[in-house]
Amino acid sequence: MKIIVSVKQVPDTSGKVAVNPDGTLNRASMQTIINPDDLNAVEAALALKDELGCKVVAFTMGPPPAEGMLRELMAMGVDEGVLITAREFGGSDTYATSQIIAAGIDTYGVDEDDIILAGRQAIDGDTAQVGPQIAEKLHLPQITYAGEITKDGNTPVSYTHLRA
């Protein structure tokens, strides 16, 4: 069993935010961080790794410097990082991004007992679409907005807490 985590490098909006004349983020002039919600998914994956003894693989699509983010995740305990990069992928919308990442995961190999985790949404777009679109492309069941992942024997179980 392995746990695959989809992660994204995003602009650090806690500091100075640079904006282009057209109102879009000037990403080139901003520092980057691991998307906070994706970090939650990584932490859940690492907790399951400790309980189940499985392998954790992080996937990202981005420019070559995103390799640094993957190295940071590996220092935290992720076993392997996969960077999908090509100049043509720059500026991809959520659909294109999810199709590309899903193809990378499919090529890497997904077994029937594997789990794919993704953070709720990225702070630079707030769409919450890529994770569910990856699951759909790979014909996998999905649970969104999971509040907790525990195990029942050797089977991970997800709980979603709904609030009114």
List each language-model region with its residue ranges.
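Short, glycine-rich nucleotide/cofactor-binding loops
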Residues: 8, 26-40
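Residues at the starts of beta-strands that form the adenosine-phosphate
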Residues: 2, 53-57, 80
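Short Gly/Thr/Asp-enriched flexible loops that form oxyanion-binding sites at enzyme active sites
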Residues: 125-138, 142
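Positively charged, low-complexity intrinsically disordered leader regions
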Residues: 1-18
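Conserved small/polar residues in nucleotide/adenosyl-binding loops
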Residues: 160-164
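Glycine-rich phosphate-binding loop signature in dinucleotide/nucleotide-binding domains
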Residues: 107-113
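A glycine-rich helix N-cap at a beta->alpha junction
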Residues: 69-96
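Histidine-anchored nucleotide/phosphate-binding helix
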Residues: 38-49
